[in-house]
């Protein structure tokens, strides 16, 4: 239901004069190559990037970016003076109240318990902390796009990559848009890397960008598969062959258009263990873990990096470790 609030705000923005991507979306629709679900995902993606400045979701909810309840609507509700005052002055409180008040597809309220608590004790609730917990304490932009089976999730990632590069090349100093990309294929699927890369390589950017821009951007793309298992022979730079592939693209300052694909397991340390306090830390001297650490370090050096995790639900118990790795980047 949080998604419902985002979509409502997105539609309002898209129909306003502030939205400058209408022609771009119209072009995508005119090509007839993208499914409706993909178009809607792209609209939402650009709304979060442009209108919302690519800020973390918890911050956007706390700032009332998706609030739609008006003062008139609040005044018509049975609320105490204190509750109404807090909802009118605290955007995070209003966001949480609006979320809990929504109805699902069955007509059931999302959380009667939560709205009742806000009505009874609005001054005792730490609204910002609640939103941080909802979004797992993530303090960077982290968006999940869930499409139906067969709706083209990998193509959608490719579309996002080209769209980011399009805006990044227009405004190199705009940090909202990525210049380089790492795609983490499911660690549980050993043969998923090559198909993922091939799908992205074969994606026709003219589906989302007009020519000659589409072809110009594609010519600047660099694709790397980081799937080597064995250490390379002695080298002055590194013993990890996957790191060698990245090192060839130095200096990184002006690097733009790199798309690297690897299995999630390549960057997850088996030696990541949980301390009593709940934190993950490294406790291993295994070669595999040293190589994973080295690869993570070099990936983290890539400028304006966007991380795509493909079907992360396949990672099972590895998803917690993977989140820890992404947090460090």
What would you call each of these model-derived segments?
Residues 1-329:
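RecA-like P-loop NTPase motor core of helicase/translocase proteins
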